[in-house]
Amino acid sequence: MKRYVIAGNWKMNFTPAEATSFINEIKPMIEGKNNCDIIFCAPYVTIAAAQEAAKGSQIKIGAENVHFADKGAYTGEVSAKMLTSCGVEYVIIGHSERRQYFGETDETVNLRTKAALAAGMKVILCLGEVKEQRLAGITKEVVSMQTKLDLAGVSAEDMKNVIIAYEPVW
């Protein structure tokens, strides 16, 4: 049977109480839907509350970002080791907003991807073109190059823990 992945991120929304309420509303809607993985990637401050609310359901809680270093002077960042110590299994890397607003590059996406995989996490890798590239008709070339650069050095074995999400920057 084909297995589907339904993943979403909450961006900078939901307090812990709102996250709990949202998950409690969703849980009855997905009962018995065993052919899909449902993943909500949450802001760091809501992860614990979301995990607690998701207990006993098929909902998995992930993070919206991860840094490539294990530790250090990276104010505001969180390492893969920190996330896994909190029971976080999934992480989004390369989201269009991270690329657009925070200047994430294919190089930093690659470093983050390898760090998350090394920590045993599952990566939701976002790929996609900017509007100008879409209008120029080079989407396929751009996404192909991103795939090559973002996954450089990632083994075939590690690819079992990578989910590719098409997420354009427009």
For the regions a protein language model found, what residue spans apply to each?
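Active-site loop-to-helix "anion-binding N-cap" substructures in soluble metabolic enzymes
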Residues: 1-170
